[in-house]
Amino acid sequence: MSDSKEPRVQQLGLLEEDPTTSGIRLFPRDFQFQQIHGHKSSTGCLGHGALVLQLLSFTLLAGVLVAILVQVSKVPSSLSQEQSEQDAIYQNLTQLKAAVGELSEKSKLQEIYQELTQLKAAVGELPEKSKLQEIYQELTQLKAAVGELPEKSKLQEIYQELTQLKAAVGELPEKSKLQEIYQELTRLKAAVGELPEKSKLQEIYQELTQLKAALGKLPDQSKQQQIYQELTDLKTAFERLCRHCPKDWTFFQGNCYFMSNSQRNWHNSVTACQEVRAQLVVIKSAEEQNFLQLQTSRSNRFSWMGLSDLNQEGTWQWVDGSPLSPSFQRYWNSGEPNNSGNEDCAEFSGSGWNDNRCDVDNYWICKKPTVCFRDE
């Protein structure tokens, strides 16, 4: 028994500590015991590593689940917002439908119908402006022509035309206006019957002016057309007697205008107009200015007028000796007249007037009053 125990004690005595390590180290003699102890230590380390990996996996999984839950929680909020917007749209459509439904009510339609009826009636009472303007022009031309007619046989023809005009006016419905026109025509007829004297012609001129004013107030369109036809016939009768202006001249408000097709300086243009018993144009009214400006701008021609400051610099005067009216200053183009390089004569330029040197060649415009021109 003692022999068997002693070797064990000796084997145990062989164990020694290695002072350089924190664990127990076995020498080669105890190799078998060292191997068993190392196996247990590595097994413990592996167990701890697996536990750490599992914890990391659970953490990641929990993070993913939280993210999914956050996204899912947002869906009901978005759906709720869309639902509220749809409810608001539906409510607006409901109100709009109710408002539209009220538009078709009979009372509303009747109100609209009444408004349209009143508008239609008002429009129906308006005179036909183009016809009245044409009548005005016809009367203006007639007035100018009557002033030059001395022959009694021709005046009898006028008398007949005016008699027909009186009969047509006599059928018009508005009594107060018709009485006024009838009186005017009666005096006109009496004046025409005595025509040869110049004073009588002036009286006819006045009567026609008053008749023109009275005709401008007539509302009945059918009667206006009848009067218009009578005046057309009267115009035709006058045109058989004479022309208002010579060939190649243009008639406007009792005057004849010649727009040249060649060019001369200002002084020679004055002479050219005098040679045809006319005058380099002198403008007397805004209507005449607009008419002439339109003619020159359409043809895109710079044209002389009878205006200059040759007598005194800065004092503009027409060729008939009359001064330039202050109200006509607005017709100068912007910055004109500027007297740049002795510019003493006026021309039509673009949409207004310009001062230019008098020795420049331009087109020119002559003017003279209407007379009776017979065809040879």
Swiss-Prot record:
The chain crosses the membrane at residues 50-70. Sequence repeats lie at residues 108-130, 131-153, 154-176, 177-199, 200-222, 223-245. One of its GO terms (molecular function) is D-mannose binding. Residues 108-246 are annotated as: 6 X approximate tandem repeats. It is found in: Membrane. GO terms for biological process: adaptive immune response; endocytosis; immune response; innate immune response; receptor-mediated virion attachment to host cell. Coiled coil: none annotated. Residues 1-49 are cytoplasmic. Disulfide bonds join C242-C372, C245-C256, C273-C366, C345-C358. GO terms for cellular component: external side of plasma membrane. It holds the Pfam family Lectin_C. Keywords: Adaptive immunity, Calcium, Disulfide bond, Endocytosis, Glycoprotein, Immunity, Innate immunity, Lectin, Mannose-binding, Membrane, Metal-binding, Receptor, Repeat, Signal-anchor, Transmembrane, Transmembrane helix. Ca(2+) binds at E336, N338, S340, E343, N354, D355. Its main location: membrane. It is a single-pass type II membrane protein. PROSITE patterns: C_TYPE_LECTIN_1, C_TYPE_LECTIN_2. Probable pathogen-recognition receptor involved in peripheral immune surveillance in liver. May mediate the endocytosis of pathogens which are subsequently degraded in lysosomal compartments. Probably recognizes in a calcium-dependent manner high mannose N-linked oligosaccharides in a variety of pathogen antigens. Is a receptor for ICAM3, probably by binding to mannose-like carbohydrates. The tandem repeat domain, also called neck domain, mediates oligomerization. This is C-type lectin domain family 4 member M. The lineage of its organism: Eukaryota, Metazoa, Chordata, Craniata, Vertebrata.
